[in-house]
């Protein structure tokens, strides 16, 4: 899995299939 998703996504991120996706 992924940890602290959204830290580098301007606090807008989602963990999908073990990867952090920004939106």
From Swiss-Prot:
Keywords: Amidation, Disulfide bond, Ion channel impairing toxin, Neurotoxin, Potassium channel impairing toxin, Secreted, Toxin, Voltage-gated potassium channel impairing toxin. One of its GO terms (cellular component) is extracellular region. Its main location: secreted. Contains 3 disulfide bonds. Transmembrane segments: none annotated. It is found in: Secreted. Expressed by the venom gland. The modification Tyrosine amide is found at residue 23. GO terms for molecular function: potassium channel regulator activity; toxin activity. Belongs to the short scorpion toxin superfamily. Potassium channel inhibitor family. May block voltage-gated potassium channels (Kv). This is Peptide 2412. It comes from Tityus stigmurus.
């Amino acid at each position: 899995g992924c940890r602290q998703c959204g830290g580098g996504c301007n606090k807008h991120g989602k963990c999908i299939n073990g990867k952090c996706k920004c939106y």
